[in-house]
């Protein structure tokens, strides 16, 4: 049984959405997704999934806010404390099981309304035992970037080239509020945040709500034929971010494991030749290159392919043609969508 994305809706994609609460944003995105899919949530949708986290909402047991805004009142509704892409994976399995025909997936972010955003980041790193008095919670990204550079031979210029590519590409995306026309020198000489990363190499935050509707093949056919078919889904888990003593610096083995599993399901043996483009993690500039390496999209020579323009929009294999998170912004649990 194949699974398709039959509808998508969103609201926001701005650094600040002052006019609506996160629950109202969820509602607006849901209405647009159901209209795009041509479904009635009270009649056609069998289950609902929301990706959210108590710390971001500022409310304990925040899943109690999930059903009403997305049409899931008195219906099967579950919440996942993780990225929206995990919700898609869960919905995919639910549909493949045969127990559900149509599943709606929702994820949102309103970081502009989080007064203690810095403190939330600090708390996630276990400040009680492991990371006492760490002035900048982004230190892990700096350590990881430095380890990756040392292992791979990637230079500061290569990291900056990723930011230049994605920031400039985002200018063509109306949903990329952090895009900018920048040069290599401007990125390298911008304000240092945590070595080796500068301001332009760290994604900002964006308010958004996104809703995606998945359906089984037989149902999807009834809603037309212009769908996005999901051929492979896989995931793997590493140690948590707080367990820095166990982290394999400069590598991302969980991403490699997940990619190999997804490729196998989709029947892909050579991803660089059998796929046309990739949207990968880039909330920090170095992560795009590390992700490409772990995904098998260039091997150990990804930085040399970057130099040649291979990953540019007009190159042999465009990467993050949307502008990535460096242009769109970090949308908390909605980033994967």
Task: Describe each PLM feature range.
Residues 1-83, 90, 148-155, 177-186, ...:
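Conserved active-site "lid/cap" helical segment
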Residues 134-184:
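N-terminal leader/propeptide and maturation segments of large enzyme subunits in energy/redox metabolism
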Residues 17-19, 114-120, 171-175, 241-243, ...:
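Short acidic, glycine/serine/threonine-rich loops at helix termini
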Residues 56-64, 242-247, 282-305, 331:
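Short glycine/threonine-rich loop-to-helix capping motif typified by GTGT followed
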Residues 19-27, 60, 85, 135-142, ...:
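Electropositive phosphate-/nucleotide-binding environments in soluble metabolic enzymes
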Residues 1-23, 127, 161, 192-261, ...:
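Condensing-enzyme catalytic core mediating Claisen C-C bond formation in acyl metabolism
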Residues 42-52, 78-79, 103-108, 157-164, ...:
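Beta-strand segments within the central parallel beta-sheet cores of soluble alpha/beta enzyme folds
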Residues 14, 52-102, 106-140, 178-204, ...:
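Conserved catalytic cysteine-centered active-site region
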């Amino acid at each position: 049984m194949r699974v398709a994305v039959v509808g998508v809706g969103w609201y926001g994609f701005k650094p600040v959405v002052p006019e609506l609460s996160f629950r109202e944003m969820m509602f607006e995105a849901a209405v647009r997704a159901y209209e795009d899919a041509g479904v009635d949530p009270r009649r056609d949708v069998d289950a609902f999934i929301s990706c959210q986290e108590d710390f971001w909402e500022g409310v304990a047991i925040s899943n109690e806010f999930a059903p009403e805004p997305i049409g899931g009142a008195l219906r099967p509704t579950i919440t996942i404390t993780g990225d929206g892409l995990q919700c898609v994976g869960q919905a995919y399995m639910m549909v493949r099981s045969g127990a559900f025909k149509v599943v709606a997936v929702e994820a949102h972010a309103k970081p502009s309304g989080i007064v203690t955003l810095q403190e939330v980041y600090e708390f996630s790193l276990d400040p009680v035992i492991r990371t006492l008095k760490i002035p900048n919670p982004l230190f892990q990204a700096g350590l990881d970037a430095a380890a990756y550079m040392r292992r791979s031979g990637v230079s500061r210029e290569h990291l900056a080239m990723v930011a230049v590519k994605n920031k400039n590409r985002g200018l063509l995306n109306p949903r990329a509020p952090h895009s900018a026309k920048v040069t290599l020198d401007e990125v390298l000489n911008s304000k240092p945040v945590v070595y080796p990363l500068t301001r332009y190499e760290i994604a900002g935050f964006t308010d958004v709500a996104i809703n995606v509707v998945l359906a089984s093949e037989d149902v999807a056919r009834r809603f037309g034929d212009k769908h996005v078919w999901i051929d492979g889904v896989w995931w793997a888990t590493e140690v948590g971010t707080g367990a820095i003593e166990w982290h394999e610096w400069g590598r991302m083995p969980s991403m490699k494991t997940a990619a190999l599993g997804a490729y196998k399901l989709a029947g892909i043996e050579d991803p660089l030749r059998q796929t046309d483009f990739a949207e990968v993690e880039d909330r920090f500039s170095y992560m795009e290159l590390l992700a490409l390496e772990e995904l098998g999209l260039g091997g150990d020579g990804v930085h040399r392919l970057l130099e040649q323009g291979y990953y540019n929009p007009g190159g042999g294999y465009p990467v993050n043609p949307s502008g990535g998170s460096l242009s769109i912004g970090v949308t908390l649990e909605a980033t994967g969508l």
